[in-house]
Every structure is written in C-alpha cells, then in structure tokens.
Amino acid sequence: MRTGHVALAIATLMTTTTLPAIAEDSGHWHGLGVLTVANETTIKVEDRANHVVRVLDEDGAIYNADGAPFLNKARYQVAAIIDSGVTGNGYKTFTDADGSKAFAKFTVTESKPPELKGTFQFTGGTGKYTGITGNGTFNLVRLSDKVAWDELVGDYKIPTAVAGTANKN
C-alpha cells in the first residue's frame, strides 16, 4: 500500500511541474553616452592623396534615457577602424556594474564630420546579457578630437531560463 502512495505522489509531482523553460527579456532601448579617445593610431596609406586609416580605442559611459535598468549607467567602450571617412566599423562593449557585458558590432552608414551615423547589432554577452540579440542605429557627434557623445536607439532580446513552473491544469 505504501508503494502505491509513493508512486501516486511521484506521478502527481511529474504531471504538475515542467522542466525549465526559456523565456525572453526584450525591449526597446534609448542609450545616451559619452566617449573619450583613450588611444589612437593614424596610418598614412599612399595609394591616393590624403588617405589615412585611424584605429580608435574609446572609453566612456552610457545611461538608459528612459531610466530602465537595461544598460543603465554602464561602462561604454568602442574599438573603431575609420578609413578616411569612406568606411568605418568596429565593436562596442557595454559593461554593467555587476560585470555583465553586452557586445555589439557597428558599421558607419553616413559620415558628415563631425557627425557619424550607422547601425549596430548585438552579437552576444556575458552574465545577465548572455545570448543577447538585437539591433539599432547610432548617431555619434565628435565634440573635439578627444570627446564625442553617442545616441543609440534599438531593440534587444535576452533569453532567460525560467525554473520549473507549476502546471495550472
């Protein structure tokens, strides 16, 4: 008789719970940031007049303009390659206070100095940003040779594991 009760309890437990499910944290993001040039290398290319390639290492901070917790008050780093205003691309790294990181790659689509416009795409992350995807646009304005502000607008999705939930049936 006791075996029957144990079997019934196990069967009930198995039908009222599920394995971890995948949920998703998603939203719209409006980030405002400031960057300073930490390191810059300029390389002259002699194939045409005034052709230079710049490699920039920038460091700064970004906050969520809507006050939401996503990438709010985070460190903001950029590694960029700019080819005489013809092309520009690189990588953005956002680091939250808890150490979680979100990574993005970007491409400049319009260059009218001191303003650069382009697109970015989240490529992954660590900690709470593991598996992040999404994309958006940016508008960067150089205030001097060492300082810029950047406005980013886009959407993101972050998969999150949800512990076994009770079956409501």
Where are these regions (language model features)?
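Positively charged n-region of N-terminal signal peptides that target proteins for export
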Residues: 1-5
